[in-house]
């Protein structure tokens, strides 16, 4: 069972704005200014220009930090760079490290950039060692990130408890999504037992009003992180299959079998059952063509009130899991 409770636009790609050592991926005089010279205006919307500028700035292999080698941060990074002609992860050095240590790693010259959820990118900016290059939303505008996952046998044996978990996540997301809850949420998360960070830095991520560099430049990203609107927590099987398709291609796995298994992991049936009776407007479908929604679009739903946000990939590709499977079967025959 999988129930997403956060959307990857809350992630950001952060770049060192200091000089690096001779063995770094960027030349000694590289940094934020060189990327601007290479055409990146830090407008937070153009992932193609940002990626091309980053690739052009490298002298050797880029060193990029991610929280886990198998994570949405890594998948977005691989998709982005590979689409621009830099094979990933083969063409870059991916370093796994805890998010709270990433700003320190940038400062120490251990990595050139990192991709992780906020507020850790903003901490690099606060410490004067990094700049925010672009949000994950500019790579895939409505991608999944975090999951609530349990074993399928446990979900079957503990139907009541698993349903309560789903409802708790749903209600929490709905509350956090309310703008009036942001300041309190930031204050709670700032406590020493949680993030132990200034609440104003956390609030930036919740609002999407970001300071992106030590120059004090600001960018506002609508929907930077989503907790509720647009069926944000709905476990779309097509999103699970997109992840499986990427992994299968990179690791040499059977694509058809990978997509089949991925569809069994995301469980919209459990999600619907857990939220039945609370007047929540859920999608009528459990899968969709990923990357096909250009503007907010009404879709078939239980009460006819649901609108899905844009879900475009930066390169305008789409992913249709059914077509992918049909193509694989046809190729076999």
Go through the PLM ranges and name each one.
Residues 105-107:
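Hydrophobic residues within well-ordered alpha-helices
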Residues 241-333:
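Conserved C-terminal helix/tail region of periplasmic/extracytoplasmic solute-binding proteins
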Residues 101-102, 120:
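Short acidic active-site motifs
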Residues 1-89, 95, 112-125, 129-142:
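Short, glycine-/small- and polar/acidic-enriched structural segments
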Residues 21, 87, 153-162:
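Short helix-loop capping/hinge motifs at secondary-structure junctions, enriched
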Residues 161-272:
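Secondary-structure end/capping motifs
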Residues 129-158, 166:
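Periplasmic-binding protein-like
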């Amino acid at each position: 069972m999988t129930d997403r409770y956060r959307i990857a636009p809350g992630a950001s790609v952060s770049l060192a704005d200091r000089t690096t050592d001779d063995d770094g991926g960027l030349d000694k005089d590289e940094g934020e200014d060189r990327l601007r010279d290479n055409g990146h205006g830090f407008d937070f919307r153009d992932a193609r220009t940002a990626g091309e500028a980053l690739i052009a700035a490298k002298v050797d292999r880029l060193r990029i930090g991610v929280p886990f080698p198998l994570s949405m941060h890594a998948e977005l990074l691989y998709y982005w760079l590979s689409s621009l002609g830099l094979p990933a992860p083969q063409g870059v050095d991916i370093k796994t490290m805890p998010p709270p240590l990433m700003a320190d790693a940038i400062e120490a010259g251990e990595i050139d950039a990192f991709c992780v959820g906020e507020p850790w990118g903003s901490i690099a900016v606060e410490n004067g060692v990094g700049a925010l290059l672009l949000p994950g939303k500019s790579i895939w505008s409505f991608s999944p990130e975090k999951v609530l996952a349990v074993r399928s046998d446990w979900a079957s044996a503990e139907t009541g408890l698993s349903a309560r978990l789903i409802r708790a996540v749903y209600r929490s997301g709905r509350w956090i999504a309310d703008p009036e809850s942001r300041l309190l949420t930031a204050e709670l998360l700032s406590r020493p037992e949680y993030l132990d960070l200034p609440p104003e830095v956390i609030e930036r991520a919740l609002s999407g009003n970001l300071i992106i560099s030590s120059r004090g430049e600001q960018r506002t990203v609508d929907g930077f992180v989503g907790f509720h609107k647009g069926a944000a927590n709905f476990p779309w099987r097509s999103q699970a299959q997109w992840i499986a398709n990427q992994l299968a291609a990179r690791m040499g796995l059977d694509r058809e079998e990978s997509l089949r298994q991925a569809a069994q992991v995301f469980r919209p049936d459990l999600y619907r059952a857990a939220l039945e009776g609370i007047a929540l407007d859920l999608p009528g479908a459990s899968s969709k063509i990923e990357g096909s929604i250009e503007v907010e679009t009404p879709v078939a739903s239980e009460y006819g009130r649901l609108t899905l946000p844009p879900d475009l990939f930066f390169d305008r590709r789409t992913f249709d899991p059914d077509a992918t499977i049909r193509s694989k079967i046809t190729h076999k025959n």
